[in-house]
């Protein structure tokens, strides 16, 4: 049985995630420095800003991406109305390195929502 969340619930979850990342950006940057000696500018450019940008793009486009798409029916299926319905598969396992980029774990999470 597919796991279904409506689009507004998904957007809400993504907005909450974005707000947490924005609120705790300095803590994330500090952790990246302490663990990997990643400079602040590099952490902002490649980790937090990239992830926030990905979140904004997903929030902006999720309704369009999830919309039912009408497609031209095949002559083999005549008479029919064909369309593509994008539905979630269910639970997702995200495998990411524990010792490197924050965004390598976050971007698949964003896409999974």
Features from the language model and the residues they span:
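N-terminal Rossmann-like NAD(P)+-binding subdomain of aldehyde/semialdehyde dehydrogenases
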Residues: 1-83
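Conserved small-residue-rich beta-alpha loop and adjacent elements
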Residues: 74-113
């Amino acid at each position: 049985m597919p796991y279904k969340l409506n689009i507004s619930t998904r957007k809400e979850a993504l907005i909450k995630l974005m707000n947490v990342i924005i609120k705790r950006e300095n803590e994330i940057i500090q952790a990246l420095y302490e663990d990997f000696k990643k400079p602040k500018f590099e952490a902002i450019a490649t980790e937090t800003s990239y992830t926030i940008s990905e979140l904004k793009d997903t929030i902006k486009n999720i309704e369009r991406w999830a919309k039912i798409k009408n497609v031209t029916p095949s002559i083999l299926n005549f008479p029919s109305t064909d369309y593509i319905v994008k539905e979630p598969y269910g639970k997702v396992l995200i495998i990411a390195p524990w010792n490197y980029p924050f965004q390598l774990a976050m971007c698949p999470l964003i896409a999974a929502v």
